[in-house]
Regions:
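Short, intrinsically disordered terminal tails adjacent to the first/last structured region
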Residues: 1-8
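Bacterial N-terminal signal peptides that target proteins for export
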Residues: 9-27
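Short beta-strand element of the alpha/beta-hydrolase
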Residues: 148-156
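Bacterial signal peptide processing site
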Residues: 38-40
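Lipolytic serine-hydrolase domain surface
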Residues: 42-140, 144, 157-159, 165, ...
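Bacterial N-terminal signal peptides
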Residues: 26-35
């Protein structure tokens, strides 16, 4: 046996012979930890109010998911949010009202989790982008019935207000570049800002995104007479889109109470839908899925996914009981024309049907969950744009020329 090192003998003797000194050292370390904790006390009033609001809103008894999923590396999360327009990566835009209108329909001032809304007054606020910036305007002005195409866009997770507004302008640049008709872009801006606890935020924002389905359903109800409506959802925003379509078609989501204002659109198969990196279970749109009726009034669905997505690769941790696979990681299955995919965890190439087109952007954008990477680097994003605009004859995968 190797002889004990001379340098370790005093430490061993200390542990064996001086229990009181060991206790004193332990108490001293505990005091240091307590002191460092008290150094940050008390928190400011705003943080206290924010936590109280979260506690009150979390009193809902509805169950949506059971556990968060984690990123592969700390840098795998989306890029940091923008706190001011001075830090924005979007230059000032001059929007021609004859071509496009850009609106923010916001629920950020409301509770982030809820089970019902007042269909006569849901409490949403509206802003329109003008030559002088974002200006408050009446919500009814955004929902007027005219001949403009209406595109409802729901952003993803970890988006502060300014970041979401900038994202709407980025999307508008792609749309206006290719559009042949006037359109009105309505972004549903929901409470999804990054908080100090990112893992808990993922869990909570997954619930919040599902609650936004009530607002998407309400918007579709208000636009039921409108002749031309498209929807786009990114990441968690896709939950709100498919959930809203499901509710609008008469479907029920456990834990939600939704009162429809109409019987749905007058014309069947009228909505065009596109999802980018959808953070929802790949079988939710199947006949037995949670949003089974989402495609009842949809003429076509385009899904862009990434089989190399480092975030959605861990999507199974969002519910440790069902261990779901994200449609944004492996595409949707169980739908008409896709019944042959019996293994929900299979990630092989998917067939294209007359109603559903799915494209893997992994080879183009690599290991990322960035929305802007899909827009700028996925060769199929122009298929999404032309699908939303109803310009299917132009829907060919080509490289974008938009720059920032």
């Amino acid at each position: 046996m190797t002889e004990t090192s001379t340098s370790l003998k005093p430490l061993i003797a200390f542990k064996q012979s001086y229990p009181i000194e060991r206790l004193w050292v332990g108490l001293h370390l505990a005091l240091l930890v307590a002191t460092s904790c008290l150094a940050n006390w008390p928190p400011d009033k705003q943080s206290v109010d924010t936590k109280l609001q979260k506690l009150e809103s979390s009193a809902s008894k509805h169950r949506f998911v059971s556990a968060p999923f984690t990123p592969e590396t700390p840098t795998a999360w989306p890029e940091p949010h923008v706190n001011s327009h001075e830090d924005s990566d979007v230059p000032c835009q001059v929007i021609d009202p004859g071509i496009s209108e850009v609106w923010e329909i916001s629920s950020r001032h409301m509770a982030d989790r809820f089970g019902c809304i007042n269909p006569l007054n849901p409490g949403l606020s509206a802003k329109r982008y003008t030559s002088t910036g974002w200006q408050p305007q009446a919500l009814d002005d955004a929902l007027i019935s005219d001949d403009r195409l209406v595109i409802i866009y729901v952003h993803g997770n970890f988006m502060e207000t300014n970041n979401a507004l900038d994202r709407a302008l980025i999307l508008n640049k792609y749309l206006s570049q290719r559009s042949q008709i006037p359109y009105r872009l309505l972004m549903l801006s929901w409470p999804s800002a990054r908080e100090p606890h990112p893992l808990r935020d993922v869990y909570e924002n997954a619930q919040s995104a599902e609650c936004q389905a009530l607002f998407v359903g309400w918007l579709l109800d208000k636009l039921h007479d409108h002749p031309n409506v498209s929807l786009l959802g990114f990441s968690f925003g896709a939950r709100a889109v498919t959930g809203g379509l499901h509710l609008n078609a008469g479907g029920i989501i456990p834990g939600f109470q939704y009162i429809r204002l109409s019987d749905g659109p007058k014309a069947p198969d009228r909505y065009r839908v596109a999802l980018v990196a959808p953070a929802l279970d790949r079988d939710w749109l199947a006949p037995t899925g949670k949003h089974a009726q989402a495609l009842n009034h949809v003429s076509g669905l385009v899904n862009l996914y990434n089989s190399r997505d480092p975030i959605l690769r861990r999507f199974r941790f969002i519910d440790r009981l069902s261990r779901p696979v994200a449609a944004g990681f492996a595409g949707f299955i169980g739908l008409q024309g896709l019944e042959g995919v019996s293994n929900p965890r299979a990630t092989g190439p998917l067939a294209t049907t007359s109603k559903i087109r799915q494209f893997d952007c992994g080879s183009g954008i690599g290991t990322t969950h960035s929305e802007k990477s899909y827009y700028a680097q996925c060769p199929y994003f122009n298929v999404v744009i032309d699908h939303l605009l109803g310009q299917e004859t132009n829907a060919k995968p080509v490289e974008s020329t938009v720059s920032f």
